[in-house]
């Protein structure tokens, strides 16, 4: 499989470019850009800004956002359109 290039645009100067936390990481960490801490009540939903926009190289590519391991079981928090 050939490597692909994903172009990105910084929309907020506070944004962090996704990065792999360890050499064995399966995916890069994506961070929120918030003006103040966010608290969600049970069943409340919210869009969480990252301060980034991405451009995939073509229709054969997809970008997926996964919750961190244990986030749902430990905190009852999951993504509305999450995988799994």
Segments the model singles out, each with a brief description of its role:
Residues 1-84:
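DUTPase catalytic domain/fold
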């Amino acid at each position: 499989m050939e490597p692909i290039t994903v172009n990105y645009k910084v929309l907020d100067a506070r944004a962090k470019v996704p990065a792999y936390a360890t050499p064995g990481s399966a995916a890069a960490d994506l961070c929120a850009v918030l003006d103040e801490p966010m608290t969600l009540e049970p069943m409340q939903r919210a869009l969480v800004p990252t301060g980034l926009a991405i451009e995939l190289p073509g229709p054969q590519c997809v970008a997926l956002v996964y919750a961190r391991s244990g986030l749902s079981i430990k905190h009852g928090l999951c993504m509305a359109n999450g995988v799994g």
